């Protein structure tokens, strides 16, 4: 076996007009680092082509801040095809080609030419040389081998065994002393680090649908907890305001409509608004703030769902509401603040085009304007909250960005961020106690045949696996999957998101594998978002409702990754940064190919429970009430093969007495 990128150089590609391009990420390398970066990129290429390609790569580095190797991108749109149309020596090798192409197609990817799937910087891999080599390796991969991918670089095929993972991925796993924005930015430019976000570098993105069920759950539970809405009612007659219509944030208007709310989402990028409108993910578009609020108000009066995209800056939108005494009941933000100085947050007063130009021409001035805008953003939210608005951080590092902009007032202890911030994150208040602590999280699947009828069959099968009488969450999830087809959620290949707990995931997974075995559907890829019960450690989001001090520890995510490796998931991934930024999270995920075999049944019975209950156990040990209840029940029902260590809860009066005597 011999892998080589090319025998002749491919022609330089034609870039399709109108397809979004990533901004200049900034070139800050020293001459010595630049030399290394060029040599790093050229090591993928036979030496006879170096003289021609070295200047080309130098130009990319200087003008884009990265070497992407545009010449090696295949022509056209990389739409995911049916698994049968891919070459490969094992089903997993073909299946992961489906997933990669889906991550990079024009309908899905934020910046397709720069391999960015979503979240401003979340890449499948670093460059097109890596993409081509990964595809070659996947075509050669057998059941006795594992492909190892390190920050986008395919290290090679290594002998393993059929019940081992076929692909193991890590992204941006930087050594602690260098695990910061500055050193990461240098490593990215040098071509040795890839920001995989979550499902971008983990090859498991399914379009904005991937977050829409979680957003739906968050909004519905926020309404129940903060607005007093009964369990059997939705958000009709209530207003939700936020920002962002990107790959993840674009789920907000769709989720709000499904939840019955009136919703206004601000977005500075007209292209993103146009995309979401054409996809049916937002109902109305306006650049007039008064009109946006009027449309929402009229829908509220009629108890009708409504979603409005406001083309403009969210700071202006909120200041208008504060000036005009408009009541906003639920408020959040989903700008990409994990990359706040790299274009993820557009300062008030700048158009999107001015933002892009300033990023290239004067990064320091751009940074200054971001800080000024964040401080304004904080002040207007503070005024709205004082008037009764419920604001929640959507886990995008928004409050951390405000803190970093110099606003110490936002920290809970007034000194640093170690005790959290004055407003809750959605995990801290809603998703943690109401979903994660029970084991509910973003389970998903992809019908690898590409057939819509397979998706309809799996929807029906999943629905039949849910006991609506067990918990309120189960009824919500049942209603979600019942209405999924009607809500037109698919963007890209045929996929579905469905929040489920450990037993629900295992039950559905085994049912799907049985359906494949019987020939009722084609092969199915199972997976989840890294943003899950066990998959991510981040005090700024996923573990923000863990209060025993371990919210800063990453043992859970690493153990989840290692456990999924040991149990034979088809793909396992571990990343740095997630949705909150480098150094702020460790996150992992998996992919599992259902081929109908009994071998897969055995893996599912072990791995699906571990993937969830390891996180529930950790949350239980942190003395989270619902996680303790769930763990105790699990010990009773699965005591033959499992046992979760349960905490003894200290008496508060005893502890308080000792503390007061200090």
Residue ranges: model-predicted function:
Residues 295-324, 328, 626-662:
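C-terminal domain-closing interface element
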Residues 146-151, 169, 242, 265-266, ...:
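General beta-strand structural signal in soluble alpha/beta enzymes
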Residues 290-508:
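Core active-site phosphate/anionic-ligand binding loop and the adjoining beta-turn-alpha structural block
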Residues 1-214, 220, 224-227, 231-232, ...:
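N-terminal ligand-binding/catalytic initiation module
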Residues 101-113, 186, 192-199, 217, ...:
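Catalytic cofactor-binding cores of redox enzymes
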Residues 140-145, 260-261, 327-330, 383-390, ...:
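Structural alpha-beta junctions
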Residues 197-220, 224, 231, 236-239, ...:
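Catalytic or ion-translocation cores adjacent to nucleophile or general acid/base/metal-coordination motifs
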Residues 257-259, 322-327, 407-411, 516, ...:
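Short, solvent-exposed amphipathic alpha-helical segments in soluble enzyme
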